[in-house]
Amino acid sequence: MDLWQLLLTLALAGSSDAFSGRETTAAVLSRVSQSLLSVNPGLKTNSSKEPKFTKCRSPELETFSCRWTDAVHHGLKSPGPIQLFYTRRNTQEGTQEWKECPDYVSAGENSCYFNSSFTSIWIPYCIKLTSNGGTVDEKCFSVDQIVQPDPPIALNWTLLNISLTGVHADIQVRWEAPPNADIQKGWMVLEYELQYKEVNETQWKMMDPILSTSVPLYSLRVDKEYEVRVRSRQRKSENYGEFSEVLYVKLPQMSQFTCEEDFYYPWLLIIIFGISGLTVMLFVFLFSKQQRIKMLILPPVPVPKIKGIDPDLLKEGKLEEVNTILAIHDSYKPEFHSDDSWVEFIELDIEDPDEKTEGLDTDRLLSSDHEKSRSNLGVKDGDSGRTSCYEPDMLETDFNANDIHDGTSEVVQPQRLKGEADLLCLDQKNQNNSPYHDACPAIHQPSVIQAEKNKPQPLLIDGAESTHQAAHIQLSNPSSLANIDFYAQVSDITPAGSVVLSPGQKNNGGMSQWDMHPEVVSLCQANFIMDNAYFCEADAKKCIPVTPHIKVESHTEPSFNQEDIYITTESLTTTARRPGTAEHVPGSEMPVPDYTSIHIVQSPQGLILNATALPLPDKEFLSSCGYVAQTN
């Protein structure tokens, strides 16, 4: 440096005679100095540079060393000696004593080495540099903070596998820990960082820190050469040590073809051509199936087609011509569905509870006060009646037939009953020649009733005036009370919709018990004519005559069980007839017809029943209450 300054001074002194004035000399000197600084930046105008600490490190956490820079002095005067002093910050010692560096040689030039005797791991240190009696630099630290391990040694690699294409390969890199680091005893725990790159590259690829001394490298090119290096640091520390020596990795070429370039699949071209092909196929399919797809997406509106009718007539709205064509052809007449079965329902009037007891069939048969009302023939539009399911034309036909039947029955029935009674009496008089013809007037009315019952034609209940007369005749003669049929309950409903009633009892000929006990007859008649539908058990027992002196083997006394307290009027009538029949031998047994089904519902208060040819066997009905029910 001094030589350059001397040459510069001589040059300036020699050129001072060529230039006049100080200003010119100063300008020349500044230009020369800038030229020299551009050539050699180390030539500065400052006279000196103070020494500084560069770093302090402990490679194995047992010893440490510190280094500093050399002092630079550009003046003519040489710098003084550089000394290092240290002290420990011990809290037990009251004063701090500065001591000079124990070894300036072991760690090299411009360094101080502290062996294990002067090293304390958990005690902080303070160091300073002095020159010519003054402090140049100062620093404080602890040994565990300056740990920087030595580089790992013995790096090598192992081939793991090569890809099927022979382009890439995987390797395993191994190394050993620094020899001076006590890893086996656990005095130090090191973390390793591996870096690798291709030979021609400048940027290193770093891997995550690991605790093991081996790491795999994947997908390395076979035709490339790689550089690998490793460094370490104390765990939980930020200061890495020096890098190890560089390991060069050259992978062998296993395949016969050269791997100068990567073999890439043309995925982009494959995708483009694939989409194009699918689009073309879709358009071809749509074009070939155009009509069918149109039918599926937009189905045509069906045109009304009738055989023998031009569809244009329907489109133009000429309905009169269409109706004319339909009227000509009988095949186009509307067909009624005959498969639908009509169900007949009995009208029930549940508005007034008192009317239920007044409209019983038995009371209508026995009562003469009930007169037919023409106003009852009106149709009641209810959900439970016939009007809810019958057609209006059918309804008018039924009512017209009922009106004609009611009108004729009022005039013809009395004459028919009287004529048949006369014929019956005359027949008995001619055959028997007995004095019974005197009693014909007495039995005239019951015979007429039996003859009328034996006819298979339907019986009109509460529909004509003759029925009321027959009921009045029966009430005038007590012996005819047993011939009355009591329809106790509905037993079944046929599939056709008819209602089947429970059967009645047979009428045994001969003298009845009513003739033997007239007071019982009058009492029972009074009880039966009662408007109430229920009568007491005690009254029912009064109707049964007591015959203690007559013993008949086939006779069985009726018993009223305490559990079955209800008895029916049929059982009561049968019980009242049996004492007489046991005492007298029956002369003839005439069956009383049982009207077991409803023929026509004439009006809300009238029923026409069907008569059966043969009587059904007797049935015993057990009831379970203390009142006798007189039902329809």
Curated annotation (Swiss-Prot):
* UniProt PTM: The soluble form (GHBP) is produced by phorbol ester-promoted proteolytic cleavage at the cell surface (shedding) by ADAM17/TACE. Shedding is inhibited by growth hormone (GH) binding to the receptor probably due to a conformational change in GHR rendering the receptor inaccessible to ADAM17.
Q: Which residues carry this modification: Phosphotyrosine?
A: Y487, Y595
Signal peptide range: 1-18
Residues spanned by motif UbE motif = 340-349
Compartmental location: Cell membrane
Which SUPFAM superfamilies would you find in this protein's record? Fibronectin type III
Annotated protein name in UniProt: Growth hormone receptor
Instruction: Locate the motif WSXWS motif.
Output: 240-244
> What is the scientific name of the source organism?
Saimiri boliviensis boliviensis (Bolivian squirrel monkey)
Q: Name one GO biological process term.
A: endocytosis
The residue numbers the entry assigns to motif Box 1 motif are 297-305
Instruction: List the gene name.
Output: GHR
Record-annotated membrane-spanning stretches: 265-288
Q: What is known of its domains?
A: The WSXWS motif appears to be necessary for proper protein folding and thereby efficient intracellular transport and cell-surface receptor binding. The box 1 motif is required for JAK interaction and/or activation.
Q: Which UniProt keywords apply?
A: Cell membrane, Disulfide bond, Endocytosis, Glycoprotein, Membrane, Phosphoprotein, Receptor, Secreted, Signal, Transmembrane, Transmembrane helix, Ubl conjugation
Region of interest (Disordered), ranges: 356-386
Primary site of residence: membrane
How does the record classify its membrane topology? Single-pass type I membrane protein
What task does this protein carry out? Receptor for pituitary gland growth hormone (GH1) involved in regulating postnatal body growth. On ligand binding, couples to the JAK2/STAT5 pathway.
Mapped to this chain, the residue ranges on the Extracellular side of the membrane are 19-264
Read off the PANTHER family from this record.
CYTOKINE RECEPTOR, INTERLEUKIN 5 RECEPTOR SUBUNIT ALPHA
Q: Which GO terms describe its cellular component?
A: external side of plasma membrane; extracellular region
